[in-house]
Amino acid sequence: MTENNEFDVADLRREYIRGGLRRSDLTENPLELFERWLKQACEARLPDPTAMCVATVDTNGQPYQRIVLLKHYDDQGLVFYTNLGSRKAQQLAENPHISLLFPWHMLDRQVVFLGKAERLSTLEVLKYFHSRPKDSQIGAWVSQQSSRISARGVLESKFLELKQKFQQGDVPLPSFWGGFRVKFDSVEFWQGGEHRLHDRFIYQREADAWKIDRLAP
């Protein structure tokens, strides 16, 4: 507490004692280590282990962040879906550089991907869209993401209207809904350590291989 008995965030601290990260723990390909950590996050029953903070930048250099769910990953990149009229999609159209952060607090871990985002093909988007629950498909039609609305009731009324409309048959893919693949060229792994001596390793793509360096915490 401060002199005025106000809540002081500077008083909040803890030690990171869940273990370290050594070079011998690393894999040649960062995606293999990411997959291992992601599976461990799932096994630890972390809430939303696929949630990632997506950072983009507007034309004025103003950064924006939001939480989005990872939906696929492989050597080609990491995939997420969104409304193409959203702020992030519009910013990526102007500047494809992007950062993805996975914050696994309960394991004292985080992973950061840096790269460029590119639009998915309509076929890829369509395949995923129809794998979603029908109500989620309808929800994609309802929201003009980031637009201003007068009340939540506007969304709920539109949802009920469209649910009736699409009661029979498949829900068509909205033209304004799509996805991005993040082709990454840098991945940093962070593991909390005692006395704030955290372990950090960064992978950077060099031609067809990955260069690995330890970073000071």
From Swiss-Prot:
Short name of any one Pfam family annotated for the protein: PNP_phzG_C
PROSITE patterns in alphabetical order: PYRIDOX_OXIDASE (PS01064)
EC number annotated for this UniProt entry: 1.4.3.5
Sites where the protein binds FMN: 66-71, 81-82, 87-88, 110, 145-146, 190, 200
Function: Catalyzes the oxidation of either pyridoxine 5'-phosphate (PNP) or pyridoxamine 5'-phosphate (PMP) into pyridoxal 5'-phosphate (PLP).
Oligomer and partners: Homodimer.
Family: Belongs to the pyridoxamine 5'-phosphate oxidase family.
Protein's name in the database: Pyridoxine/pyridoxamine 5'-phosphate oxidase
Organism: Yersinia pseudotuberculosis serotype O:1b (strain IP 31758)
Gene from which this protein is expressed: pdxH
